[in-house]
């Protein structure tokens, strides 16, 4: 990893805190952004963990505006500057995506992170053209987001390599669980300052950094950002033993909300854990729902014992 790269470090795919009525919880957004800044991690708003496909356009813009304002009013104590705001972009109407991306950029988002449209199965050529269209059209820098688990498509490595040379495409967040693919994608970004690799497979955060990755995107960072901040620093500063130890510890914490649950259920459970720290309530956006009171109580007790 080249620390000269503009985009690097820990980017937490932030939950979207909402009220019982399903409206954005602005106060909770502010609390979480300050919590992240204190631990020198940045947020990815409206990604998979943030229920991105369920956030309305109006709330999405309010989310970005609130996060940007909080980040600038509460800079990271470590750097003295505002943390970077990454804004997720999902959807199937490209013209609407371009408008929304520009609204986020105008509101102060630093990077737009876009998944593939998911209604139709796309050919590699169509995937490449989609990202070229976005990159050519939007006002802010673009990061590719590959997530097979939800899009049911995988952006081929050769497509990523070609897109990596587009002047407005600054990196890749890859959540696909494939070690060979990880190595191949890191090889694309290695020794380049214009394109960064972020690992979205949280359980392999340390491994990706050891291979030369630039950043990590762990959902468990919503609960323990300080552990991932330390993991990153240990990995890039020549302390692999400590990085591996932290990887093992955070993997165990992740089991509290992930084990035996669907992806959607795990996001509810993660909010329950965050509630124990006074960060947000465990309300969800439709179609996701809360867990039973008994299950929430069990999760909360485990979270308090961490």
Where does each model-flagged region fall?
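Catalytic alpha/beta core domains of metabolic enzymes, predominantly
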Residues: 136-137, 148-254
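C-terminal alpha-helical cap/extension of soluble enzyme domains
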Residues: 6-16, 39-40, 220, 224-306
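A structural signal for short hydrophobic/aromatic patches embedded in well-ordered alpha helices
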Residues: 32, 63, 130, 163, ...
């Amino acid at each position: 990893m080249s620390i000269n790269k503009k985009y690097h470090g820990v980017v937490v795919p932030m939950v979207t805190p909402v009220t019982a009525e399903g409206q954005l919880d602005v106060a909770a957004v502010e609390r979480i952004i300050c919590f992240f800044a204190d631990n020198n991690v940045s947020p990815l708003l409206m990604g998979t963990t943030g229920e991105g496909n369920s956030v309305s356009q109006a709330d999405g813009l309010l989310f970005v505006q609130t996060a940007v304002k909080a980040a600038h009013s509460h800079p990271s104590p470590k750097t003295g500057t505002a943390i970077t705001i990454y804004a997720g972009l999902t959807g199937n109407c490209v013209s609407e995506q371009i408008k929304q991306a520009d609204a986020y950029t105008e509101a102060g988002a630093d990077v737009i992170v876009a998944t593939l449209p998911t209604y139709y199965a796309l050919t590699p050529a169509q995937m490449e053209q989609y990202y070229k269209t976005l990159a050519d059209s939007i006002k802010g820098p673009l990061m590719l987001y590959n997530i097979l688990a939800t899009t049911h498509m995988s952006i081929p490595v050769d497509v990523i390599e070609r897109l990596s040379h587009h002047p407005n495409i600054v990196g890749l967040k890859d959540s696909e669980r494939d070690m060979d693919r990880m190595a191949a994608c890191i090889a694309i970004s290695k020794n380049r300052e214009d394109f960064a690799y972020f690992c979205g497979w949280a359980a392999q955060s340390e491994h990706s950094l050891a291979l030369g990755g630039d950043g990590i995107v762990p959902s468990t960072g919503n609960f323990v950002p300080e552990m991932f901040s330390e993991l990153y620093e240990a990995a890039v500063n020549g302390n692999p033993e400590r990085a591996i130890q932290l990887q093992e510890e955070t993997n165990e914490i992740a089991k509290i909300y992930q084990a035996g649950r669907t992806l959607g259920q795990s996001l509810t459970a993660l909010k329950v854990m965050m509630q124990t720290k006074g960060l947000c309530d465990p309300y969800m956006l439709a179609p996701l729902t809360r867990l039973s009171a008994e299950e929430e109580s069990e999760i909360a007790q485990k979270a308090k014992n961490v």
